[in-house]
Swiss-Prot record:
Location (main, coarse): secreted
Organism: Galleria mellonella
Disulfide bonds: C583-C628, C585-C635
Protein name: Phenoloxidase subunit 2
Similarity comment text for this entry: Belongs to the tyrosinase family.
Keywords from the UniProt entry: Copper, Disulfide bond, Glycoprotein, Metal-binding, Monooxygenase, Oxidoreductase, Secreted
Amino acid sequence: MTDRVKSLQLLFDRPNEPLITPKGENGAIFQLTQDLLPVDYEDNGIALNNRFGEEADEKIPLKPLSNPPQFPIASQLPTDADFSLFLPRHQEMATEVIDVLMNIPENQLDDLLSSCVYARGRLNPQLFNYCYSVVLMHRRDTRNVPIQNFAETFPSKFLDSQAFAQARETAAVFPRGIPRTPIIIPRDYTATDLEEEHRLAYWREDIGINLHHWQWHLVYPFTASDRSIVAKDRRGELFFYMHQQIIARYNCERINNSLKRVKKFNNWREPIPEAYFPKLDSLTSSRGWPPRQANMTWQDLNRPVDGLNVTISDMERWRRNLEEAVSMGTVTLPDGSTRPLDIDTLGNMVEASILSPNRELYGSVHNNGHSFSAYVHDPSHRYLENFGVIADEATTMRDPFFYRWHAWVDDLFQKHKESNFVRPYSRSELENPGVQVTSVSVETQGSPQNVLSTFWMSSDVDLSRGLDFSNRGPVYARFTHLNHRPFRYVIKVNNSGNARRTTVRIFISPKFDERNLAWSLVDQRKMFIEMDRFVTPLKAGENTITRQSTESTFTIPFEQTFRDLSVQADDPRRVDLAAFNFCGCGWPQHMLVPKGTEAGAPYVFFVMLSNYDLDRIDEPGNSPEISCKEASSFCGLRDRKYPDKRAMGFPFDRPSRTATSIEDFILPNMALQDITIRLNNVVEANPRNPRT
């Protein structure tokens, strides 16, 4: 019997091609029946399918559907349109498809496969890919089906549009088995350094960073009829913390590039000075992504085709209601009653997810902000224009305005954390009696102690799985990205009490602000980026804790971003790569360390060993061995509580009651060490690139 896992995975292959053609590197053919044919091939599809099948080495039989699924809403999205979860109409479509596929009885994989084949042939390919990925991730019987790397199936969302004409030529001219020269993606293809924001293009346009954002929202969708798909443990708080860390990391990069911290978008009626020209084409719609000219302004949105009829006044009213909730420390429910406001509830209110306690009162400020920004060029659909990159989860982080918008969103969360209703931590919550950190350091092979080394690397990604209607065989695009030398943390601890467990929390932050002045803790606490968090045993007496940078619970392994590359021999998590689906939303390992500067950027390295009795999550059936540990701090754990009882970002998520600087904040169970991040401004070829 054909392996159903492999068959389900093949539905990701070449998403704009019909299933009557062979799929996968081995040219497998789905044996379509008349009821499963795409609409455009109902007259001659069987004959074409049979013709392709004559040369196929693998044939996949499909169970006929006596009652094919119906998609009255989702089928209204043209197959050549682009899809955005930020648009209310598209949310309705996605909800319909997810409902239908989730409701197919469990362990009826033949029925599921045929239904997915039917849906794939009738729905917009981007809509289907999103819904199909969510379904595979959330059905118990499909969790072992690998979700295809999105950059391989829809490469046009990540790479310069000029690359695809070259890619088709390469696929057409070079027979399979003949080495194919990679297509070089320029480092500066969206702007020049005349535009100061372009200094951050290496970061904003990084494939791994954009994949992170897309995958996180796949694991944490904000809408679905099945509430359990959305209502994961501490989901709203994780929405806050994941985006807060993005802003902190972005500000670190800005300071390293001699720029000020990002300015929040506070006045929603003022012009947006930042322009962005993405230089991307959609292979689905065969159109270029619309640019945004400098100094454009938000306009009231009236686009019935997208389900959008929202005014700036609506947004300002919802904003006032959110700010009132923060200032009062309470959330008002639809029946007029109130309850105390917490960070998890606020996260769901601001986004807003279906978990928002009062959507009518608090609106959907975050999501609509993306839509306002994406349609500044055509707010009323007068010109039949598509949305900009900021309205697509896979491209939104490319746009400089994403960070200005999220700086405002984060500021609202910080006001809650700084309010009188969120108590600063007491000493007893911060200390760990009997535990004293005596020294901390970072060690990088070939570098002095406490120096982290970054450099540029050129890596290849295979475009062929998304290169529809072209010959098979790998077609590589080579692009340049930031990377760093692997390093390790060395932490020496004296435990004067009994043997115990402790949570090690590791952060770094720039030592000085953009004016080269020492930080006040009220500002620096928002600049600390969490590098790792893990639980370790302490024996009585002296302990030395060593931890490899590749073990971080915030990141996914390097080769998970560049999926076709062979496993890194020094990555201790390589055996767990099959468990990528849920934990794959972590931060890319190659972007763990900020760029630094060639002269050496001064940073501070903070380590805290917190009291495990206050950190521990007691959960029935909890096992110390979890199959998927990668990025658990950013992604949580499947079907489990978030693996840390403390507030996300602890101990820097709240202002200090007494300390005015990070030096004042240090207790015996903490340590601070000056480190340097030095950029070696050269490009190294990835030794794991396929030979060409």
